[in-house]
Amino acid sequence: QLLSKEHLVEAVNKLGLNRRGVVTARRVARYADGLSESGGESKARALMIERGWQTLELQIELFDPVEPGRPYRVDYLWRVGDRLIIGEFDGFVKSEKAAEEGKLAKAQFDERQRESRLSLLDNCKIVRLCWDDLRDPTKLDRKLKVAGVPRAC
């Protein structure tokens, strides 16, 4: 880790109020988190924050209900009462790499099995996000609303 969140917030706060962009920098620093695994995940999270969706947990391990010792890490997780809403961002990097290695069909099969297992968790819903949703944030809003993600208070 190059810089802790606390040090980033401290550095931005030292800039003073009269510097151009300091308000935006403070907001960004407040939400900084190194857990996102791709630019798409980070951009989606930024849009969710900007558009007023409830904050979420990043890169959370959930366990396979069929094989309880088997963990699956999810991109986003919202806990809403006794329900879990899992968010997954689908970029192209993993698919492209699998295709280059001649393993695309296996990767797609494994992903379907993973999603099938996660969907068996009690009171669980899965929402898949993609670059299209980021280019048209109203699509992102509709998906999150239908999935049951609450707005921030």
Locations of the language-model features?
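Surface segments flanking catalytic/ligand-binding clefts of nucleic-acid enzymes
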Residues: 1-153
